[in-house]
Amino acid sequence: MASKGGREKIKLVSTAETGHFYTTTKNKKTMPEKMSIIKFDPKARKHVEYKEAKLK
């Protein structure tokens, strides 16, 4: 049986205010700060910054 990992599920929310989001995981031990990444927003039809939010 596998042990519990240190990975946490997170939601990446678009800063273009379209309501679009991606879900992913991150290792909270090696990356304690909030994640920010540039990805494609299909609703805005361009690359925008996505910021980390809690996944409920």
Swiss-Prot record:
Belongs to the bacterial ribosomal protein bL33 family. GO terms for biological process: translation. The keyword Hydrolase does not apply. InterPro entries: Ribosomal_bL33 (IPR001705), Ribosomal_bL33_CS (IPR018264), Ribosomal_bL33_sf (IPR038584), Ribosomal_zn-bd (IPR011332). It comes from Acidovorax ebreus (strain TPSY) (Diaphorobacter sp. (strain TPSY)). It comes from the Bacteria. Keywords: Ribonucleoprotein, Ribosomal protein. NCBIfam families: PRK00595.1, rpmG_bact. One of its GO terms (molecular function) is structural constituent of ribosome. This is Large ribosomal subunit protein bL33. Gene3D superfamilies: Ribosomal protein L33. The lineage of its organism: Bacteria, Pseudomonadati, Pseudomonadota, Betaproteobacteria, Burkholderiales. One of its GO terms (cellular component) is cytosolic large ribosomal subunit.
